[in-house]
Amino acid sequence: MPHLILSDASLAFGHVPLLDHAEFQLDPGERVALIGRNGCGKSSLLRALAGQGALDDGSVWRQPGIRMGYVPQEPPFDPELSVFEAVVAGMGEVSALLAEYHAVSHAMAEPGADQATLLDRLHALQGELEARQAWSFESQAERVIQRFSLDPDARVGTLSGGQKKRLALAQALAVTPDLLLLDEPTNHLDIGAIEWLEELLIGSPTSIVFITHDRRFLDRVSTRIVELDRGRLLSCPGNFSAYQAKKEQILHDEAVANAKFDKFLAQEEVWIRKGVEARRTRNEGRVLRLEQLRRERAARRDRQGKVELALDSGEKSGKLVAELTHVSKSFGDKGVVRDFSCRLQRGDKIGLIGPNGAGKTTLLRLILGELAPDAGTARLGTRLQVAYFDQFRTQLDEEAALVDVISPGSDYVE
């Protein structure tokens, strides 16, 4: 029996349909990669499959009783929750009991705690958890937190972007899902975590639909590729390499068919312009066919071309871009940068790598002057024009129109 069926689905924002009577079926054990251009509707489709978003028309059927995990592209978490509380929050009605049991257990270890009151509450919680047979949920939550190398007592608000992504994956996997929906699961993850996630998904019997732009991840994990292209879903068995070969042929066939259609339409347009009124009356069927051809051509959505982007170098800066001298930075007891020195010069292209939570973003902010070092000095060069794209895109005004963000104060982009 299928785990999921999407039937005759339509969804539009504005005048362009993201889904145009789309069809999709997910069978047990499949790992389907959902691909397509940015903005084509992949995340909207995944939200609809997860029951987090509504379709304009059509339906989503899920196997009754199926356990489902969903990880959105930017998971929303309460920053005041602990990692353990955030993970068990996805476990339904027992989540509050488990979170309180975890909190009371830790409170008993605090100096000056009211042991008698806390012990009474702990016994009451134990009884409720036993009545709901919920101990397996706690052990599963602890196992998955450990597998993702997270501190169960850490506050969500203190986590790095990569650690928050690990947390979202842990929350989804803690319910041992039959169906897993993942939107950009490799975003913010370090190289080791991506490789670990690949092995986890490949070895799992769970049915998976995932969105990613990571080609290696696509090739290793997927058993089927589904492309969302101009509102329709094109399915291709196998991995991304197999899909690329098939897609090239599909695009060639489409181009040939469109060229034939356009040539025939042009011939009919010539005929209708040259024909006298009497001929049009005798050939009413041909006139009606031409009108239908015009409607079909107007409805056809041609494939978008590739973006051509040229970056201006701007005003030439000094040779020195930034210099850090014996810089150190800590957060509480955790040392992130220790006695670090470097010099960045004009034209350098540097890749900064390291495990999640190691301090890569902190180092960038130290270089930019957004953070002050605890020790040492950080200075920027002269005549710099800095473009900073942070992982959470906080520099973007989400209420502004797109044209105002890309080209403020101008009516066009050159």
Locate the predicted segments by residue:
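ABC ATP-binding cassette signature C-motif
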Residues: 1-258, 309, 313-414
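Intracellular alpha-helical coupling/juxtamembrane segments of multi-pass membrane proteins
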Residues: 246-289, 293-300
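Alpha-helical segments in transporter systems
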Residues: 126-127, 275-278, 285-288, 306-314
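Active-site phosphate-binding and catalytic loops of NTP-dependent enzymes
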Residues: 298-302, 306, 376
